[in-house]
Amino acid sequence: MDNIIGGQAQQVEDTDGTRVQNEFSKFLKSFKDQKNEFIYKSAMKELVQPEKNTIFINMQHLYKFSNNLATTIELQYYRVYPFMCEALHLATLDACDESERQQMFKKQLYVSLFNLDAKTKVRELSADKVGGLVRIAGQIVRTHPVHPELSRACFVCEDCGVTTRDVQQQFRYTQPTKCANPQCMNRTRFSLDVNSSTFVDFQKIRIQETQAELPRGSIPRTVDVIVRGEMVETVQPGDKCDIVGTLIVIPDIAQLSTPGLRAETSNQNRGRATDKSEGITGLKALGVRDLTYKMAFLACHIQQTESLVGGDASGAVEETDYLDLWSKMSTEDRATLKKMSDDKKIEKNIVDSLFPNIYGNHEVKLGVLLMLLGGVAKKSRDEGTSLRGDINVCLVGDPSTAKSQVLKAVEEFSPRAIYTSGKASSAAGLTAAVVKDEESFEFVIEAGALMLADNGVCCIDEFDKMDLKDQVAIHEAMEQQTISITKAGVKATLNARASILAAANPVNGRYDRSRPLKYNVQMSAPIMSRFDLFFVLVDECNEVTDYAIARRILDNHRAISEHTERDSVYKIDDIKKYIAFARCFKPKISDKAAETLVREYKKLRMSDSNNAATSSWRITVRQLESLVRLSEALARLHCGKEVLVEHVEKAAELLNKSIVRVEQPDIALDDDDFDNNIMVVEADKENQRGDDSMDHDGEKENAPKIDIAKLKISFKEYKQLSDVLVLHMRSDEDNQGEDEYDGVKQSALVEWYLSTIEADLETEEDFNVQKTICERVIHRLIHQDHVLLEVEQGEDPTLCVHPNYVIADE
């Protein structure tokens, strides 16, 4: 008792902790891996570097070394962790040189444990897990700024000046119980010596349980995770992570201001004269009476779940060079990627392996694959303007055409993907919201779907159901790939470097093929121009296709995996590694590819300016950038360092299929503007002429009569006839030479056409019908479509082809 009164109380030695410290020290010094190397000895030598303070221990190595030691650490982790850190500190000092020991003596070191077998769901974290080592998984929804935390404090007594060192701080400011000087009776008046105290990096992260762990009808739960040392700033909002650590219980400091505590404090101080100023009252009574506790997760190791080749996720991999990534791969991975890159049918094989449950729609699947690969992001030399490399894709079509299925498949496959619905999402939910922090009461930015999908894919279903004001909010994110916020005193520009995969339904439920795309979807022109690819999925009645789709669906319901084995040439993990490796390539555009790009863009512009074209929406310079991005993605797909002509042609073909996919109505060639000697009458009105027929002159009476229905041709027939006439005129021009060519007479052109189809003309009426159709098609090409030009006007004009006219799919 005299020892307790006169000086410090005697501390009880933790024998179990000391035993763990000794055994863990032996493990660090003597453990050898499969290559018979002391891996942890070399790791301890690296701790001398100023930025290193954590050693990473594989739990399987601990079990292999001593099952008893590993079990003790797993069951009593929070109790023995300080002893493990002390063992690491002493072992590191032994491994250091004399010059390095002084530097390492005051350094705070940490032990990070990973590769724990059992995984606990966030919902299962309860009081029985407190203090034990557990592994949880979740998605990061918020990260707080990194700030210094007082780890070991050094206090100076204000009465006698004696210094008390190494006072451990447990999540709150903790002073010594009494002065270290036995003659000094001070218990409260201490000042902190900042220079002699130890501070460490501290960050709080909030994770949310994943959808796979979510029970039916439940709301996702969140838990606060505390990370220190090298673990800070290793993850970002949106990452799916595996976290190893322990569940701890900490006092809820925010509850100190509850009415019950204020009343208690005022009763204690009532009638007591004191001039001591206090900040937060009630700190001495932490854990007493109506103060509540809250749970938090103290992490010792955190890493992204979807780690790819080289140990990084897709967003980080793209920043590295492909040669560096290749050097980090295992021999098995190298062989697999080499085999895939040499595959001549890699497009089809990867597409079939990615979407085994979706039948057909090869172009759609290829477009989604190119979106996952992406183009090369660039910055202009002079202005420094950023040019996005991500590809945006929109799927428009009838119900039950597997649009949402494609989105779900991408969400499951992509390492960083967010799935959301347009109708259930607001502008703030898609971009970012400003909310008040529950502890600091300051306004902080809460990441939205596009921020969470940074360096990934944001899948937006029911895109057409979004309100117009919400669509406007993502204009900036889709083109500049940033989100600007100015609200509640917070002004920030945030990154949203995500590809957008959207699905939309037509206006009236079914796609009207007789109308252009812009009239079939409820989207503004600025939004439509920001999509690189538009795919129209029409539910057509086709016996062969319907049978194949029905067979595929029934196979899925009957749990028959034959189609999966047949279609899946590659494993999903291999495809992930291949895409991550391919994204490291930054292909350059060759001179021939640049010429092809210009030529294909001019084709698109000419088709858009032509009234007879089947363009879905306005072709702008953004479509040229889309061509560049798609060409780069195709080059990446083949792991190419250069964009070739075939890549550009394939990209142009894909863009054409997504743009020019509108059926035009039949064309009626029965206008009254034509001046010819053929009288067009309707069959049901022939007998109603009566006395009116007496008014016609001799020429008109002798003119042949043609049924109006026979002068109605489909748009496809019209295009075929116009292309035949244009090709004939251009061949004449090539044969005669540009200098000698004067054009073709209309009558000669009609006669040539009739001579080519002479074998199909059986009656005089057929001859008159085809002649009239040809003349009226020529008239439309001159006056309406402006494909042909009149060199000489008159009853029989001389014609030539417009020099800028380009035949589609020539």
Curated annotation (Swiss-Prot):
The subcellular localization recorded is: Nucleus
Which EC class heads this enzyme's classification? hydrolase
Q: Which reaction does it catalyse?
A: ATP + H2O = ADP + phosphate + H(+)
Which residues are noted in the entry as ATP-binding? G397, D398, P399, S400, T401, A402, K403, S404
Q: Where are the transmembrane segments?
A: none
List its EC numbers: 3.6.4.12
- Show the PROSITE patterns listed in the entry: MCM_1 (PS00847), MCM_2 (PS50051)
GO biological process, alphabetically ordered: DNA replication; DNA replication initiation; double-strand break repair via break-induced replication; mitotic DNA replication; premeiotic DNA replication
Q: Does the keyword Hydrolase apply?
A: yes
Chief place of localization: nucleus
> MCM domain location, by residue?
346-554
Kindly list the GO CC terms recorded for this protein: MCM complex; nucleus
User: InterPro entries, alphabetically?
Assistant: MCM, MCM6, Mcm6_C, MCM_CS, MCM_dom, MCM_lid, MCM_N, MCM_OB
* UniProtKB keywords: ATP-binding, Cell cycle, DNA replication, DNA-binding, Helicase, Hydrolase, Nucleotide-binding, Nucleus
Q: Mention one GO molecular function.
A: single-stranded DNA binding
Motif interval(s): Arginine finger:
529-532
Chain's role: Acts as a component of the mcm2-7 complex (mcm complex) which is the putative replicative helicase essential for 'once per cell cycle' DNA replication initiation and elongation in eukaryotic cells. The active ATPase sites in the mcm2-7 ring are formed through the interaction surfaces of two neighboring subunits such that a critical structure of a conserved arginine finger motif is provided in trans relative to the ATP-binding site of the Walker A box of the adjacent subunit. The six ATPase active sites, however, are likely to contribute differentially to the complex helicase activity.
Describe its partners and assembly state.
Answer: Component of the mcm2-7 complex. The complex forms a toroidal hexameric ring with the proposed subunit order mcm2-mcm6-mcm4-mcm7-mcm3-mcm5 (By simililarity).
Q: What does the sequence similarity comment in the record state about its family?
A: Belongs to the MCM family.
Q: What else is known?
A: Early fractionation of eukaryotic MCM proteins yielded a variety of dimeric, trimeric and tetrameric complexes with unclear biological significance. Specifically a MCM467 subcomplex is shown to have in vitro helicase activity which is inhibited by the MCM2 subunit. The MCM2-7 hexamer is the proposed physiological active complex.
Query: Can you say what this protein is called?
Result: DNA replication licensing factor mcm-6
Recorded source organism is: Caenorhabditis elegans
* Gene giving rise to this polypeptide: mcm-6
